[in-house]
């Protein structure tokens, strides 16, 4: 959520930035009207409160003099009713303002390039050289099915499209990847491993910005057909990313600045409806309703967040480098960033079968956007004032897409897969999956 004071002091400028950089039309007239109503009701409530307090003091003095106070009591009661009504109206207007604020995207950092979509992202760097094959390249689906490790029909039978069952060496490789990532981040990058719920409530989803704008992208709990109609329905949603529960651990907290940065990592399944992705990546593991991800989250002091973004992105890059997977680093343009981000780097891994780079990690500085929604603050020692923290998150990495990259980049002519060197300790001595 952006700072409401920005709308009060620089409304036209903010509206222009949102239009230019986010293609978002801020309703300036509505914002102005609501702010005028808020001010008027605030003044009215304050005046009524002051007058009521003054009349209440008069009642005490009149009573001490033995005077009839019935008229004064009536006046105070009337003012009390008017004050209550004004407060109700003020709360209503403030709720409308908050709802409006919750639907406004974050303002991009100054260095973020202006652009409409991913075609205008900027390549920052590349690492590694794509392997040259002397045999016909197979995609990960052909490889996985040939090894008996990817069973998409079973996923359809159990649940539906965009689900998969993994078996044998492929399932173990998938597990090895997540363990390797967690070990790297906790042992070398300073993150604390965290286990979190996979179901979260309404407040948690508001805190990180999934609600109210992106409810259709979530899987919500509800009774199945034929279930007892008297069953209690729990108002939960499955997490779309571990960013949601992990970041919300600091919701409504005041952290000691000396304890920052707070660096947390979690391996979880993620659940997404892919509501806007109909017809895209229908083959294979690239776009699933359920996939695993190792997430990195940092909570930092405001002046440290841009430095932290470079560090966090470097941690994601290290995973790819140790796996010897070629990738490129992209700075997202304003039109391709997520709703709550102020600056984002995407890492795109080389997939030989597609002959292109595909996103495998997104690392974002959310600035104080999430912190304001969550009221996550910090305070320096000896300082009475608090300030909002800055939050960052990044994939370190998406496990399923990393599996895709390993299968395709480490394939052999006979359809077997050579296990990357750094994963061998996690594979129980298996060096080739065949």
Curated annotation (Swiss-Prot):
Q: What is its EC number?
A: 6.1.1.11
Q: Which organism is it from?
A: Glaesserella parasuis serovar 5 (strain SH0165)
Reaction(s) catalysed by this chain, per the record, are: tRNA(Ser) + L-serine + ATP = L-seryl-tRNA(Ser) + AMP + diphosphate + H(+); tRNA(Sec) + L-serine + ATP = L-seryl-tRNA(Sec) + AMP + diphosphate + H(+)
What does the function comment of this entry state?
Catalyzes the attachment of serine to tRNA(Ser). Is also able to aminoacylate tRNA(Sec) with serine, to form the misacylated tRNA L-seryl-tRNA(Sec), which will be further converted into selenocysteinyl-tRNA(Sec).
Which SUPFAM superfamilies does this chain map to? Class II aaRS and biotin synthetases, tRNA-binding arm
Protein name, per record: Serine--tRNA ligase
The UniProt entry, under PANTHER family, shows: SERINE--TRNA LIGASE (PTHR43697:SF1), SERYL-TRNA SYNTHETASE (PTHR43697)
Pathway recorded for this protein: Aminoacyl-tRNA biosynthesis; selenocysteinyl-tRNA(Sec) biosynthesis; L-seryl-tRNA(Sec) from L-serine and tRNA(Sec): step 1/1
GO terms for cellular component: cytoplasm
Q: Which GO terms describe its biological process?
A: selenocysteine biosynthetic process; seryl-tRNA aminoacylation
Subunit-level organization: Homodimer. The tRNA molecule binds across the dimer.
Gene name per UniProt: serS
Q: Any idea which UniProt keywords this protein has?
A: Aminoacyl-tRNA synthetase, ATP-binding, Cytoplasm, Ligase, Nucleotide-binding, Protein biosynthesis
Compartments where found? Cytoplasm
